[in-house]
A protein has these predicted regions:
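Short, well-structured N-terminal submotif of metal-dependent ribonuclease cores
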Residues: 1-47, 56-73
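Acidic, PIN/NYN-like endoribonuclease modules and their adjacent C-terminal/linker elements
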Residues: 1-9, 110-138
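Histidine- and aromatic-rich ligand-binding microenvironments
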Residues: 16-17, 47-48, 96-97, 130-138
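Alpha-helix capping/helix-boundary segments
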Residues: 20-21, 51, 82, 102-103, ...
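Short beta-strand scaffold positions
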Residues: 47, 77, 98, 117-118
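Phosphate- and divalent-cation-binding pockets in alpha/beta enzyme and binding domains
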Residues: 54, 64, 85, 125-126
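Acidic, metal-associated active-site segment
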Residues: 55, 97-114
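Acidic catalytic patch
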Residues: 72-93
Length: 138
């Protein structure tokens, strides 16, 4: 399992998956504390565009998610390499969780990151070959 790796220095970048964005939108204290600590340390915080697609629907119910997005900033660019890495991760993990694979690929392609998630099991499997990606469950 990928999980929290204590034998290496933690990556100084935080990526939020859909579960983390929803938890923040709902005011989850653990998610808020994790985000606050990252911001306090000056760590870049990113929400991949695929997470945006999974968490908004274009109506007034998006307001809490939009507040999280505004606090974090615009999603970073997704490149072809992200798609190719996600495909490899899906194959290695024998998974069909494309959104999760793209989140992990975003971490891999950026040289590593901590990923805050509501779906640890799937992300652990996908991140297993990449010690530079740390998965933190909510």
């Amino acid at each position: 399992m990928a999980g929290i790796r204590r034998d290496r220095q933690a990556p100084q970048r935080l990526i939020l998956d859909s579960g983390a964005v929803i938890a923040l939108a709902r005011g989850d204290q653990r998610a808020r504390a994790f985000l606050a600590r990252a911001l306090e340390l000056g760590a870049p915080v990113e929400i991949p565009v695929v997470v945006l697609a999974e968490t908004v629907r274009g109506g007034p119910r998006d307001a809490p998610v939009n507040r999280v997005l505004k606090a974090v900033g615009s999603p970073p660019e997704t490149r072809e390499a992200h798609g190719r890495t996600a495909g490899r991760l899906l194959g290695l993990a024998r998974s069909s969780e494309t959104v999760d694979a793209l989140v992990v690929a975003h971490a891999v392609e950026g040289g590593g990151a901590q990923v805050l998630t509501g779906d640890r099991e799937d992300l652990d499997r996908l991140a297993a070959p990449h010690p530079e990606v740390w998965i933190h469950p909510l």
